[in-house]
């Protein structure tokens, strides 16, 4: 985390605050306008302290060294008369993640991967494409990205929904409102489910002579 105030003397300095303290150095503060080059600082959990030092270097290698690291908090204070400074504006405070590369955030608490919609294409024109509206409970807690209660934790909380239709329904799961399909001109002798569920948005069945009777 870098906290920098404009108007100080910070020339020719490379700052690394990971497990390092700057000791026994002279601090010089001058009121002048200098050109300040903003670097990407990699934030770590280890705390360290130091002062603004003129013409010094503190370089240390570590595991997974990367310039393009995470920037959780940056506070840049720039004076109003700054023709040769960073920008001719006031203070800027930025929160959040910036260029997360080679970062280890520890264990993901209550993590899970959820696929809301399934869209399957098959170029041999044997299957249909069905987009269904799914319903499940969502726990609105924001950690690293988000936390969602999946259906394995609460199986009976989903009503009138089906996960997907992967292929033709031969010895497969039973849909909400199924249809019986009679003999047709389609090859491979596969039955195709045309309408599944109550919420139907898109149904594609190209070049089909299948006869359908409702049961």
From Swiss-Prot:
**InterPro entries, from UniProt?**
Glutamate_DH_NAD-spec (IPR019651)
Pfam families recorded for this chain? Answer: NAD-GH
Task: Spell out the note in the miscellaneous section.
Answer: Completely overlaps SSA1.
Name recorded for this polypeptide: Putative uncharacterized protein YAL004W
């Amino acid at each position: 985390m870098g906290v920098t105030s404009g108007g100080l003397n910070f020339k020719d300095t490379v700052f690394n605050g990971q497990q390092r303290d700057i000791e026994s150095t002279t601090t010089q503060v001058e009121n002048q306008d200098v050109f300040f080059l903003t670097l990407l600082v990699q934030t770590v959990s280890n705390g360290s302290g130091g002062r603004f030092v003129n013409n010094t270097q503190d370089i240390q290698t570590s595991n997974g060294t990367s310039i393009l690291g995470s920037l959780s908090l940056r506070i840049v204070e720039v004076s109003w008369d700054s023709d040769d400074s960073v920008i001719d504006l006031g203070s800027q405070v930025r929160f959040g993640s910036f260029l997360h590369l080679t970062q280890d955030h520890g264990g993901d608490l209550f993590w899970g991967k959820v696929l809301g919609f399934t869209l399957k294409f098959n170029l041999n024109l044997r299957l249909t494409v069905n987009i269904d509206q799914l319903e499940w409970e969502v726990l609105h807690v924001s950690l690293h990205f988000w936390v969602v209660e999946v259906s394995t934790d609460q199986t009976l909380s989903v009503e009138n929904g089906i996960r997907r239709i992967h292929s033709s329904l031969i010895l497969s799961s039973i849909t909400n409102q199924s249809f019986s399909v009679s003999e047709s001109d389609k090859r491979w002798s596969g039955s195709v489910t045309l309408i599944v569920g109550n919420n139907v948005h898109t149904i594609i069945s190209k070049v089909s002579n299948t006869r359908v009777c409702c049961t």
